[in-house]
């Protein structure tokens, strides 16, 4: 038989059950309901429900079938009109539990149906058994195997799975490691894993952290609606309607096996504490991935939850918060104390929304682990049982759990990682670096100013020196201008008077044309011109005298040049006509 997909809804007077049977023979179907029992059969589908309230057959019941969708819709009247049926979306809890048919259970549930007498063990007790003196034995000897799993109900399961579990849990040999030893090893591993550089990097460069903190997961909107509803009405029974399940989630619920859990007071408290621990890890994962699951999601959840990673047992809520805070700052990519507190507030919101919101989170965790190999083992140990158990928990218990979590306060000093000292030292170093950079910038500006002043002084010095050089060059030019006249005047001494018919120009000799013109104007005959290359006796005599005069009057270093010039001019120059 197949269990069909179904959905329940209600109004003040009727309970509506919608059953999807696309491949059923609609010509043959049976419906039975009485009190809290409901049964439906249409080959090959069979559905049996245990309702949270009583229904009655009074002639007002209705039924219809949608052939296009393949859905039977049945409306059944409530025995007490106006009664609210709680937990109609807890599909697994509505499915009738399976009953044992063969052997008597080792632990019986109070109120369960009696076991037939024929299955009772009638074997007689052996009175001749060998007797030994009574000796007090330690608890560890009485329980050689350590317990873990949902409510610490499992033991001896993981002995043959050590190789497969090495990537899932951090504890080695969980079947032989007591709870106290697990905690000691966990604390030591966390302390060794803590990286101050990684923490400080996220502490100072927190742009990505601030973006993550702004993300609003699905429960934020639901929580806001719930608070707005509470302001208008004090009724709390309709909170479950705020959270709905998808078809995929409903399919998950139908696949779970409905069963009862016999938990004593201590085990029940342990289950509630571990639920907080798992929800904290889930809230962190949902926030940092912004609801988009990835290949690291399963690792994040199980790594941040000591319940899943170390099979940790808890005695109070504060220890859960301390452990979660330490692991957030040691293992994941984003390590910031603000993320710890944000996950803490998100968990409170989920618990206050009720078991529908908690169940939705557990179903998501179950799906993540189921798609990850070998993390699916954690579903068998914890999550599947949580998904069934939470559907039967009273809402008041979750509300009390939320209040207990709200009363917890967590500080950085309580994490035992010396975060405040580390931050203070880092801030001090940062201030010193800032002051050092400021000093360097001031000194650099001073150096720049001094260099500019030096360049200005150099420019002024160069201008002064250039002025001096210009004046020196002008004086030298004046001297050079005066020196030719002195040379000429010295040459004109006794040999060439001012009225001489010959002049010495640029080291050469030419005829004084001015005198010739004056002589011509006075009626004096002009001197005849000699042909080029012919030297008269006067020219030769003057040439000899000029050589002697130049050698005596010109300074050293210029004698050879002037002599060569005079020789050249003496040999080639002729008087002008």
Curated annotation (Swiss-Prot):
Subunit annotation: Directly interacts with DKC1 alone, but not in the context of the core trimer composed of DKC1, NOP10 and NHP2, nor in the presence of NAF1. Does not interact with NAF1.
Location, primary (coarse class): cytoplasm
Function recorded in the entry: Required for the quantitative accumulation of H/ACA ribonucleoproteins (RNPs), including telomerase, probably through the stabilization of DKC1, from the time of its synthesis until its association with NOP10, NHP2, and NAF1 at the nascent H/ACA RNA.
Domain CS as annotated: residue spans: 1-89
Gene name per UniProt: SHQ1
Classification of source organism: Eukaryota, Metazoa, Chordata, Craniata, Vertebrata
UniProt GO cellular component terms: cytoplasm; cytosol; nucleoplasm
Natural source organism: Homo sapiens (Human)
Molecular function GO terms recorded: unfolded protein binding
Reported effect, residue 292 to K: In NEDDS; results in decreased H/ACA small nucleolar ribonucleoproteins production when expressed in a heterologous system
Protein name, as recorded: Protein SHQ1 homolog
